[in-house]
A protein has these predicted regions:
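Short acidic-glycine-tyrosine-enriched beta hairpin
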Residues: 45-49, 56-58, 81, 86-106
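Short histidine-centered beta-strand/loop micro-motifs
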Residues: 64-69, 86, 93, 112-114
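Ligand-binding loop in jelly-roll beta-barrel domains
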Residues: 90-91, 104-134
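N-terminal post-signal-peptidase region of extra-cytosolic proteins
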Residues: 58-61, 70, 107-112
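Short beta-strand/loop turn elements enriched in aromatics
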Residues: 43-44, 61-71
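Short, conserved beta-strand element in jelly-roll/cupin
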Residues: 56-58, 69-84, 123
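A short, N-terminal "cap"/entry segment at the start of jelly-roll beta-barrel domains
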Residues: 1-51, 93, 137-160
Length: 160
């Protein structure tokens, strides 16, 4: 979906800012950009700040321990593959060119590590942060045990 198709799909109409400057009349800007992710509904804490970071995991790195963010986070995998798991959702692998998002708040983010054992993985993520809250808060073992029933079933290995 192009940016202009997304614009229309979300009822933004035809009026408003046309990008101005060179190329606006040709409409080239409407096809130059490709939508990678459309997440809704999102809740951004009032007075939130935003931070974009670049993360690079070496082969097999499990990533950040279970944690949560105070606001939503939106990511794009540059190279490699991220093992991604949010509370209540099955574990999945997001490959280079793919996106992920999480709502933030109370939801636990279990995994964000490198799914590859032989190559580096890199991604960028933009996180919204509620005022007075840390951008990332680790979840302790007691809370993980208390909320274990909210975690999606774990993948099982086939017998050898």
């Amino acid at each position: 979906m192009t940016v202009s198709e997304n614009h229309a799909a979300h009822g933004h109409g035809t009026g408003g800012h046309d990008g101005g400057g060179q190329g606006a009349a040709s409409g080239g800007w409407t096809t130059a950009a490709r939508m990678l992710q459309d997440a809704s509904p999102i809740t951004v804490p009032e007075g939130a700040s935003a931070m974009t970071i670049h993360v690079a995991w070496e082969p097999g790195d499990p990533g950040t321990p279970p944690h949560r963010h105070s606001g939503p986070a939106f990511g794009y995998v540059i190279q490699g593959a991220v093992r991604f798991e949010l509370e209540g959702e099955p574990e999945r692998v997001v490959e280079a060119g793919g996106t992920f998002w999480e709502p933030g708040g109370d939801v636990i983010h279990y995994q964000d590590g490198n799914a590859l054992g032989d190559a580096r993985t890199e991604f960028v993520v933009t996180m919204m942060c509620a005022p007075g809250k840390p951008m990332l808060e680790l979840v302790d073992e007691a809370e993980l045990a208390e909320r274990a029933h909210l975690r999606a079933p774990r993948p099982t290995s086939a017998p050898s």
